[in-house]
């Protein structure tokens, strides 16, 4: 099967839900663009937990305004089912009994239909032969530990011609033995009287269910069963899924008796089925309930449907009509008002029979509980469904809520639920596990959150068997049966183990993660943020201080600058403030309050020719400014030399045209480039990453596995050459550290009950991480497990790939060329084994991925599984020793432009697991770099800032974690002892941040002082002037002389 790929995550996210073609075909055809989309969408809708009134079902399509994308209980609820919850499993007689004409059994309409309509199927004798191997069925029931077993009685096995006269003794003995064995095991029997195997004689004589004579005959048959088995049976089902009996048996012709084209016959059959059920219920209620104390119902099946637009009333109306025409057709007369739904009566008045008032009264309330079937038979074939242009969905929880609102919150038994796998799947039915998990999760949420009264659940089915129109091309059993074997051994599938665990625990226990801890990271912990490639500004943004020429504007009236020749002005030296882009970077970093900033250089910009013949000094000056200006804010840089995000990004064009990383000379060119960067920036940079995610870059060279492995080899050599160069020439003076960062998602077996999946998960880690880690951290050579696995496929003719053979010199070159371990971790992958042929890297691994739709995930399908990062850190320590580890990129995409709650949830949970690794597991974790600073337009939203630099609320959350150094106890101090240098840097930080304001303030203050000084000076001068002038006008007294 060809995998599908969803791009947009830090690594391509492969999405798998199934391993067989039939499942994939149904998934892809359902729901106008894919059932998978509907399943994932429906898992994100929380239903309103309201007490409904009859007929209020359409309210279910209104979305809850209180829904939050990070409330995990709204996606998957870790909780238990109510005490004494009824756990069961079911089968149908025709599907598993076999022996279709043995011991006096009469033929059924399906026995005839198989011979006349189904190609390549001769009979049901190839089924599980439960009629012969009853003890093996009982052992299977014991293995799972169910509370009840739902099975059907074969009407023609008891009465070969359908008429209740003398019962077939062998048939009677078989069912009596089965019931006795169940009672002995404390397993409650739930017995279905009619599961589609009408005696052929009744079809030929009366026309089957089209003739209302069958009603009385069915009642006689039911009466006999009540008499013979009622002392041991407390739960009865009259008819299993009458909709399919009528619609496919008499409408599409897909089921026996194979009639089609007569719509009036379809609704006549449905009418008679309802009346037959009602008659049997009244019979039991009057004559048997008083002393047998049992309950009786009819199993009704349905699909579920979602509106194209939840806000569109017409789409909601169509969804309501779709449900009414299938489930309401039978539920409304029995569980509702005794009549068909009003919409059906108006639309189908010419073909829909009419209930008299007395019949309505008789129909109403003829079920002691609501028995509900929700499985693949209700969803296929799609062209026969009443979709009404809307989207089919597998949301069982919504269907249960609809029943609650339409029929006044009845007690509900899930009488059939499950999915199917391809007939080639044997015991490793991984898809079935996840479908069961999804369905059971929805039932649990319906009980706990929506207060729906579900009291039991029937997994379908116990055994592989005959699957109606699909015959033996699909399997639905929890136990695998080889139909061609003589002994028909029942082998438990993975789904049987899973269901057994669910029953034992009575629900879902949270085993994967431990409780949150309180504690702090060390004071020297690196709190960082990651950015991808920073494109340098080619020219300074502010050239006015560096251009020595004088210009005159509009000298000729053309509104242009004209240079004045012969005049040169004095310029100032170049400054980092010349680059406007850097200022924006610094503003964002200052708001992040991180201690470290990881960014990548653009190799192609620094060395356009790929060698040292043409060095772009302007680009180097730009990068030096980024680092130096960051240091002024107290933010250190972790610089990545090469950060490709696709095949050619960042690789100089001449190297790209020379086959890129397939050419060994590229490694030498990288060494020269690295040496230049160490020389120009190394005095300021203490943490270096040579290559970002070489284990993903090499995947791009995928014409063959040998291309992939060759590119990886050259990438390893390039890193080692750069590390050796730094160690030899620059480390003594610069005292930095160099490593490379690996994409390092964790892997879990998709099927924990399959050894092959456990091996596949470890193989994923070997091919993904150990592929590069083993040569550098440990042996100098590729992992032995990886080499042997590829060689074994080569020997079997499945692949022509081979890992390169390293020389002794190359092993010495590679070994130990890391100063720390740098990991980019985003999610956990669920891995399954699938043997693949072909000589490519993906095929060599024999791995496929499965997405668990019950888990919280991002828009790009990145699953939020926090405990995976802790497992990864422990795995690295266990395999490569106690070394310093930096998580150099970790994050999630979140569609929110402001309140990015998913990102806050992700950060909090993942940092909790990292803290556990530090405090409990003693992993030497040295830093965490959140991915990423700013998002890019038209790409998944991983950024703390939008593409137009608007801050999101996750910044404040990350700030708080950083300032607290984790998750401290109450009243504990988060302060670290600071040196004088740190204090001074704090002052520097304030000055740099407020530099424009301070400058403006100084100018304003100086101007104000100058104006005040002038004003005071002028005032004093005026006072002196007027004083002198006034003295001149003072008169002398007569007779007085002034004697000197």
UniProtKB/Swiss-Prot annotation:
It comes from the Eukaryota. Residues 1018-1044 are cytoplasmic. Pfam families: Glyco_hydro_1 (PF00232). Contains 2 glycosyl hydrolase 1 regions. However, the first region lacks the essential Glu active site residue at position 241, and the second one lacks the essential Glu active site residue at position 889. These domains are therefore predicted to be inactive. Residues 1-996 are extracellular. Residues 77-508 are annotated as: Glycosyl hydrolase-1 1. Contributes to the transcriptional repression of cholesterol 7-alpha-hydroxylase (CYP7A1), the rate-limiting enzyme in bile acid synthesis. Probably inactive as a glycosidase. Increases the ability of FGFR1 and FGFR4 to bind FGF21. The chain crosses the membrane at residues 997-1017. GO terms for cellular component: plasma membrane. GO terms for molecular function: fibroblast growth factor binding; fibroblast growth factor receptor binding; hydrolase activity, hydrolyzing O-glycosyl compounds. Keywords: Cell membrane, Glycoprotein, Membrane, Repeat, Transmembrane, Transmembrane helix. Glycans are attached at residues 71, 120, 125, 211, 308, 391, 554, 611, 702, 706, 971. It comes from Homo sapiens. This is Beta-klotho. It is found in: Cell membrane. Interacts with FGFR1 and FGFR4. Interacts with FGF19; this interaction is direct. Interacts (via C-terminus) with FGF21; this interaction is direct. The keyword Transmembrane applies. Residues 517-967 are annotated as: Glycosyl hydrolase-1 2. Signal peptide: none annotated. Belongs to the glycosyl hydrolase 1 family. Klotho subfamily. GO terms for biological process: carbohydrate metabolic process; positive regulation of cell population proliferation; positive regulation of MAPKKK cascade by fibroblast growth factor receptor signaling pathway. The gene is KLB. It is a single-pass type III membrane protein. InterPro entries: Glyco_hydro_1 (IPR001360), Glycoside_hydrolase_SF (IPR017853).
